[in-house]
């Protein structure tokens, strides 16, 4: 489609699934301007030019989008710049206007999925969608298994037995300060070998290793006030990461999941495998066979989106990366400016 000069803004939304690097979408024009968004090294990459500028932007924080699961993507573009959203939350912004109007009146956007990449639910919006609207259009990740009782069926337990990576989600509360207990546990052959608990130290995730030694991963903090909390344990890429209420609280080296449980035959919530119950309740829980990204985890906890706009696309002397200066507008209308004080290299 074509947009006249002076446009109020435009948005595109779609869903994609990728198992390999390759192209996603591309904007063509009658001259040499235009851009393409593709996957490189399992992360989103945007490069091209408009009538005003050229750009090549590596969205490294989106790494691992080639996991074979569906992801939502949104782009908004105005004369003030453009923003890219992954799974409902903004993941990057640029000063470039990615709209067709910035590349010429005949510019058109095309879907160009490469081999091993699927695209669905593509839509064009003749306005700039708000972060809230984009979040509402983004579906939550689909769990492999949801708990409908305090324990899983034998069939569902078998589905987990070979998983070496994935994600655990649980929403719990205890009855008040100083009350703790097990949120989720798993075992095999009568022995508990995996446990997720709220303790006086914080959130503790531990798995019994093959040499009979417990591997313990802890997010230190206090989540025992009696309020509802969302706990996510993300296991993959060589680490265990623990999120509480949508935010990362611990990144710990090591990888241990249900596949580490010898002869797995039991998975329970709200108690350990011997029946000792949490001093509170687990309202709902789910298990994912994929390693959810930050945006998907925030979506599970209904974290409000943050709207940001970059000031520069590169540092001095063409530095590809730089320490980001920032401008924050408070509710009072006061603008707070922040920047790195170092001046020794161009990145500063």
Name these PLM-found stretches.
Residues 1-298, 302-303:
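Extracellular glycan-associated modules
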Residues 300-348:
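Asp-box/BNR beta-propeller blade signature and adjacent active/binding-site loops
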């Amino acid at each position: 489609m074509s947009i006249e000069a002076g446009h109020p803004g435009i948005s595109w939304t779609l869903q994609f699934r990728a198992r390999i690097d390759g192209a996603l979408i591309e904007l063509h024009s009658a001259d040499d301007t235009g851009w393409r968004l593709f996957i490189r090294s399992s992360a989103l990459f945007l490069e091209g030019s408009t009538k005003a500028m050229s750009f090549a932007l590596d969205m490294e924080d989106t790494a691992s989008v080639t996991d074979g699961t569906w992801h939502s993507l949104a782009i908004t573009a105005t004369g003030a710049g453009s923003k890219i959203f992954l799974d409902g939350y903004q993941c990057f912004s640029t000063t470039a206007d990615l709209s067709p109007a910035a590349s010429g009146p005949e510019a058109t956007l095309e879907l160009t999925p490469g081999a091993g990449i699927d695209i669905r639910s593509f839509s064009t919006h003749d306005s700039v969608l708000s972060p809230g609207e984009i979040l509402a259009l983004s579906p939550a990740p689909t769990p492999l298994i949801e708990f409908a009782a305090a324990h899983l069926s034998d069939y569902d337990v078998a589905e987990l037995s070979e998983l070496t990576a994935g994600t655990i989600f649980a929403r719990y509360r205890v009855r008040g300060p100083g009350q703790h207990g097990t949120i989720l546990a798993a075992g095999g052959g009568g022995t508990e070998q995996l446990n997720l608990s709220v303790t006086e130290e914080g959130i503790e995730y531990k798995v019994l290793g093959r040499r009979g030694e417990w591997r313990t991963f802890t997010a230190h903090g206090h989540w025992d006030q009696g309020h509802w909390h969302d706990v996510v344990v993300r296991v993959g890429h060589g680490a265990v990461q623990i999120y509480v209420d949508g935010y990362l609280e611990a990144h710990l080296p090591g990888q241990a999941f249900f596949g580490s449980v010898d002869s797995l035959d039991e998975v329970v919530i709200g108690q350990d495998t011997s029946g000792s119950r949490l001093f509170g309740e687990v309202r709902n829980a789910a298990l994912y066979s994929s390693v959810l990204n930050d945006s998907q985890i925030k979506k599970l906890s209904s974290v409000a989106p943050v709207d940001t706009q970059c000031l520069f696309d590169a540092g001095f002397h063409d530095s590809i990366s730089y320490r980001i200066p920032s401008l924050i507008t408070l509710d009072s209308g006061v603008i707070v400016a922040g920047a790195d004080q170092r001046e020794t290299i161009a990145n500063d």
